Amino acid sequence: MHCVSQDSTEFRKLFISFFVLLSVSLISVGTGKLYAAENSGLTFEALYEQQCAVCHGNELQGEAIGVPLVGSDLLHGQSLEEVAVSIAEGYPDAGMPAWSETLTTTQIRTLAVFIVEQRDSMPYGEFNVRTPMQFPEGVVASNKHAFTVEPVVEGLDQLTFSMAILPDRQFLVTEKTRGLRLISADGQQSTMIQGTPKAYHNEENPRAGVGWMLEVILHPDYADNGWIYLHFSDRCEDCNTMSRQFNRAASMNKVVRGRIEGDQWVDQETIIEFDKASYQIGSDIGAGGRTAFDSEGHLFFSIGARSPNTMSGVQDLALPWGKIHRVNLDGSIPEDNPYVGDDSALDSIWSRGHRSPQGLEVNPLSDELWSTEHGPRGGDELNIIEPGGNYGWPLHSLGINYSGSEVNYGRDELEFFRLEDIEMPIVDFTPSPAVSSFIFYQGDAFPEWKNDVLMGTLKSRELFRISIDGRREIEQEILLDDFARVRDIESGVDGEIFLLLEHIEGSQIARLIPESVEIAE
């Protein structure tokens, strides 16, 4: 967090009074959008330690003359916007100044994000990759269904990404640095499929490799044709100017399809690949890598902000990254794609401005494409993806940069910038829980959840249920809290819900099983 650093006694008094009164004087008022860029040299953590820790403790827990900012309710609201507006407008009757007269709007929002992060136990920089999984004991009673959670498959690689469930209830699982694994329905036997595109392992830092296996997904008519699609990061060395200049491997997303015979990958066909000149030397962490089918014979796939700085190229329609693409099932280009005929654009592009897409699904009720996406510090999103839509990165985000500054990269290069040209999320998640994959539940095992979004998270280790009415959220429930890093989610043959859980000491597949327990109204 960047705040204005002033050494005057008056400023110190005002800053202390702000924290003393925050817990009892938050007011709920609408706030304007924040656009002005700012760059100050002092992070929030440093400023807090300098100005406030003596009163409120290093962990915001409170001290002799300062009330705690965590661990208790705030009288006038807990949400990010309520906290931000309270800071900006103040509460003069209680002696709290209007900080909009002292701090920039970006600084105020950054301060609010920091406070809410701490209150929600989602501090910046904590990703819970080593935190043990916590399976609930006994029955979980949610708002509409009771269920239990049980492990089905254990001992998977630490870097799993995707799973598909076959008609015979076997599992296909991608392990980023190892490849494609076939697992029996009872989880007792598994086989690595031979002959798939190669997955690369970085011995020095497995979590920052180049050349990962990403999504596995079954053709809509898999039962008849056996086609399986693989979305992976195609690696090359000494293959373009950037790779040669830095003497590093480069990669870019690629989609193929094939079939499995025994333990062999056969009949491979390339669906789409990009010119080697576009391959990037950054880690595959930002690769995106999700895939979805609609009901009209189209394949969608996502590519995240793959440039080393995660900013450049995302808005450039001549480059593949930072985009969601749409092709026919055989890789040909649909004639109604939004940029067909535009010589300055790739004709596979469906939408742009994507930072780190984590989930991609088609809503069966509307055939609309939906996506989940990571923001920077805050600004995780659940979006409806419109053809030709611009989803903002790096021009705009409801989150903030990791430094605390506003997200506004590249605006000064535009002739003009209008917020109304940016597609806004259906649901914004700030602070960031690190949203992951999701489904629109269609099974019969949990009938009261039908058509709801079931969404995993990584950092916050939660499983969400979100009810949607058309294009708006009407209910949000955390089904599992402090549980595990949920990397993928799928519905099985009988409507049971399977979760792919990621952990550094070995990933797992777990299953939600409905229980006949009466739920109180």
Question: PLM features: residue spans?
Answer:
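Electrostatic cytochrome c docking/interface patches
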Residues: G30-L47, A287, L346
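Flexible coil segments in periplasmic/lumen-exposed cytochrome c-class electron-transfer proteins
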Residues: A37-L42, A46-Q51, P97-G155, T241-Q245, ...
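Extracytoplasmic electron-transfer domains, predominantly the class I c-type cytochrome c fold
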Residues: E59, E63-I65, L69-D120, M213
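Asp-box/WD-like beta-propeller blade repeats and closely related beta-sheet repeat scaffolds
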Residues: T241-A292
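Beta-propeller domain segments
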Residues: F127-S142, N202-R207, G211-M213, D221-A223, ...
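Conserved beta-strand position repeated across blades of beta-propeller domains
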Residues: V153, M163-A164, I217, A292, ...
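Surface loop/turn motifs at the tips and blade-to-blade linkers of beta-strand repeat domains
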Residues: P151-L156, Q194-G195, R207-A208, I272-D275, ...
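Gly/Gly-Pro-rich "capping" loops immediately C-terminal to redox-active cysteine motifs
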Residues: L42-A46, G57-A88, S190-H201, M311, ...
